[in-house]
């Protein structure tokens, strides 16, 4: 009997040491859990910082686009002012033309008077013939100038055709850009749907946060794309209209002026040499102005190409920044998912260890009750003194949650020196089922964990970021009090009073 008691005490000591060891393991797991919680909070803070950087990049992009648009409007205003100056010069030249025509009429009247005087001035006939020869020579020069103007007109037409080809190429590039944009939008929508499908299996709080971020990025891309396309189409239409009006005006003006000047020169060649010379100078001036206008058109085309290149570069930089921020967000989400998985594994390990602890507590309580039952059955107090009782038999039956059964006895014959010791026929066996710990408190919104006392651990701490308003449920388990009733069944032999 004493050996069985000693073995029971040694078993209790071993279980106590195991319990201390499990307690240390639980403390280590709690420390790891706190570290994971801190890491999650830091990652959420970094996520908030990345969102702020994304907003800053968007504001910078919008500011740059407004600046380029403002510069383009200023250049457009300058060009319109120059066009008004050209139109003003055209009106002035028209007035000069009218004045020249009036002078021409006066000269014709004077020529008529001179013809009347020719009959009386036969001495000046040879001089007049020389003057006519000179005028014919100048007329040939005027014809050469006309041919030069016609060649210049052909060159201008070729340049106009080239400009139309460039406009057509710009239209084709614009259509290709729209097709590529539509393809990218379709790919982006496909990726968003895949991301939405994967996101539905995650935690409720992460799903809401991802959906808000996805909607924000989608609205941002669609808004910037629509704004870019509308501005590009409007600018191309305005530039095309201005170029067409300018080219038509210059072409009509050059053709009208050249033809009118040539007719005037041919009519006045026999009348006035000085007038022909002045008209030739005016034609030369008009040719120079045509060259100046052509140079101005070239400069405008170059400025348009530079503005288009700047817009393309700004759009490319914006797309690169958005892709970089999206990649960082995906990395943070993957890291959060990995940490959540580790947290789930750690929680399961914590629960398993807690189950083992409860099982050890139940087994220790069972052994304590067995020991106290043996002491009561043997009639011993806490100090091991045997209490004398009248000889007799005692039987007892019982049942409990452990289902233990056993029989045995101890007898002593008073009238002889022989002591008979009867051992148990079978050692009592005890079966137990560990009672699982259940979270105490209200129901969690996530469906996985239940907060303690109706309030989560994250709710009792300040949420990171301050503006997200997100809370995370942390599994906190509370041990339930285990109540058990121990009843032993067995048969005791006759007792002997010492």
UniProtKB/Swiss-Prot annotation:
One of its GO terms (cellular component) is nuclear lamina. Its main location: cytoplasm. It holds the Pfam family Filament. SMART domains: Filament (SM01391). Residues 232-371 are annotated as: Coil 2. One of its GO terms (biological process) is nuclear envelope organization. Residues 393-409 have a biased composition (Gly residues). Residues 18-58 are annotated as: Coil 1A. The keyword Manganese does not apply. GO terms for molecular function: structural constituent of cytoskeleton. Residues 214-231 are annotated as: Linker 2. Keywords: Coiled coil, Cytoplasm, Intermediate filament, Stress response. The keyword Coiled coil applies. Residues 70-213 are annotated as: Coil 1B. PROSITE patterns: IF_ROD_2. Residues 59-69 are annotated as: Linker 1. InterPro entries: IF_rod_dom. Intermediate filament (IF) protein that forms both short filaments and extensive cytoskeletal networks which most likely are homomeric. Some of the cytotardin arrays display cage-like perinuclear structures, while others are located in the periphery close to the cell membrane. The entire tardigrade body is ensheathed by a grid of belt-like filaments formed by the cytotardin protein, which retain their integrity even in contracted specimens. Contains an alpha-helical IF rod domain organization with three coiled coil-forming segments (coil 1A, coil 1B, and coil 2). PANTHER family: LAMIN DM0-RELATED. Belongs to the intermediate filament family. This is Cytotardin. It comes from Hypsibius exemplaris (Freshwater tardigrade).
